Amino acid sequence: MEDKMSQMESSIETIINIFHQYSVRLGHYDTLIQKEFKQLVQKELPNFLKKQKKNEAAINEIMEDLDTNVDKQLSFEEFIMLVARLTVASHEEMHNTAPPGQGHRHGPGYGKGGSGSCSGQGSPDQGSHDLGSHGHGHGHSHGGHGHSHGGHGHSH
């Protein structure tokens, strides 16, 4: 019997499943082409990418930036960089919107969730929310414990 997944594990699985909901539609089943990426951004990230959501040129620019091997499609590894950047930007936004007070507090992020305190101390970075280039070219292999493509709610 498997242990119940933690909230973070469930969230990671949700990201993978949503990627696959869009990646299987057109082209290669495990990559996002431009049309699939645009649909994913518009439907799944409406609050995080409000400005870019309705601007096709901005969506195309984000995709080009993420497409590190310049094959006009996004692998999961390329796509997850967007998730990481949005997570960092939302965390910074939570610090910027936190009510003044002692300790390490969080206000609403771009998704309007999160409030309260967390266990860390210190002041937040006052960096920008630019989703531009950060650390391209760092590939990895699944090494036998990545996700499989059989039996997880998508067919090939």
Swiss-Prot record:
Residues with Pros-methylhistidine modification: 106
Stretches for region Disordered: 94-156
SUPFAM superfamilies the record matches: EF-hand
Tissue-specific expression: Found essentially in phagocytic cells.
Pfam family, one: S_100
PROSITE patterns noted in UniProt: EF_HAND_2, S100_CABP
One GO MF term: calcium-dependent protein binding
Cell compartments where the protein resides: Secreted; Cytoplasm; Cytoplasm, Cytoskeleton; Cell membrane
Residue intervals of the EF-hand domain: 16-51, 54-89
Compositional bias per record (Gly residues), positions renumbered to this chain: 108-119
Binding of Ca(2+) 1, residues: 23, 26, 28, 31, 36
Main location: secreted
UniProt cross-references to PANTHER family, sorted A to Z: PROTEIN S100-A9, S100 CALCIUM-BINDING PROTEIN
Protein's name in the database: Protein S100-A9
Species in which this protein is naturally found: Bos taurus (Bovine)
Gene: S100A9
